[in-house]
């Protein structure tokens, strides 16, 4: 049985919502075990609450060592100046031991993200994230254009061939759209299908 981990960091809930729909898509594939976890918050709780960070999230916090237990990992992060959030970077910077063992070599790595604006760095966030995954020897999987949501021109929407994305709005008030969530589900299903084939 293939094991898929959806691992995310979410400040205000947008990436958390996307992660839940990626899980939904992955779970639609028979014979795949799907786990949802998040990386630790690095901002002190009192300060995080003061700036509106969603501190209380249902997903348990992951440990670095458990990454080796999965056949595929789908990472989710908000954008910080065109790169992944510091919380995710801090977590990944602790994976040196896994790298030394080659523990993630040959496993699937996939990424989804959120940005504040339409051109706020969603693609650079995902592609720069890929660098770390490639150093670990992971096999990168994105979202193929077989996903019809990628060519939706009827609205302003996230979604790239590199991975699912959502636009949060400059003030965080915009929630993931139906199209963005469809793309997220597609990514989860696509990764789970490939993980199942590789694990068989």
Curated annotation (Swiss-Prot):
Record domain Flavodoxin-like: where: 4-191
Q: Which UniProt keywords apply?
A: Flavoprotein, FMN, NAD, NADP, Nucleotide-binding, Oxidoreductase
Note on cofactor: Binds 1 FMN per monomer.
Q: Pfam families, from UniProt?
A: FMN_red (PF03358)
Positions annotated to bind FMN = 10-15, 79-81, 114-120, 135
Domain of life, per UniProt, equals Bacteria
Catalytic activity from the UniProt record = a quinone + NADH + H(+) = a quinol + NAD(+); a quinone + NADPH + H(+) = a quinol + NADP(+)
Question: Which residues does the record give as NAD(+) binding sites?
Answer: 12
Which cofactor names does the annotation list? FMN
Q: State the similarity comment.
A: Belongs to the WrbA family.
Q: What is this protein called?
A: NAD(P)H dehydrogenase (quinone)
Species for this entry: Burkholderia cenocepacia (strain HI2424)
């Amino acid at each position: 049985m293939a094991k898929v981990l959806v691992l995310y960091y979410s400040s205000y809930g947008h990436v958390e919502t996307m992660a839940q729909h990626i899980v939904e898509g992955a779970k639609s594939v028979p014979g795949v075990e799907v786990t949802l976890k998040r990386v630790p918050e690095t901002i002190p709780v009192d300060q995080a609450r003061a700036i509106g960070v969603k501190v209380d999230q249902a997903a348990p916090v992951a440990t670095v060592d458990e990454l080796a237990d999965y056949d595929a990992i789908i990472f989710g992060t908000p954008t910080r100046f065109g790169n992944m959030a510091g919380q995710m970077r801090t977590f990944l910077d602790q994976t040196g031991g896994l790298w030394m063992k080659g523990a993630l070599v040959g496993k699937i790595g996939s990424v989804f993200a959120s940005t504040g604006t339409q051109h706020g760095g969603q693609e650079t966030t995902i592609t720069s994230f890929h660098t770390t995954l490639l150093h670990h020897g992971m096999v990168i999987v994105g979202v193929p254009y077989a996903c019809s949501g990628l060519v939706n021109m009827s609205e302003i929407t996230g979604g790239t061939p590199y991975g699912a994305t959502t636009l949060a709005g400059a003030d965080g008030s915009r929630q993931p759209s139906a199209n963005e969530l469809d793309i997220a589900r597609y990514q989860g299903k696509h990764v789970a299908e490939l993980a199942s084939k590789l694990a068989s």
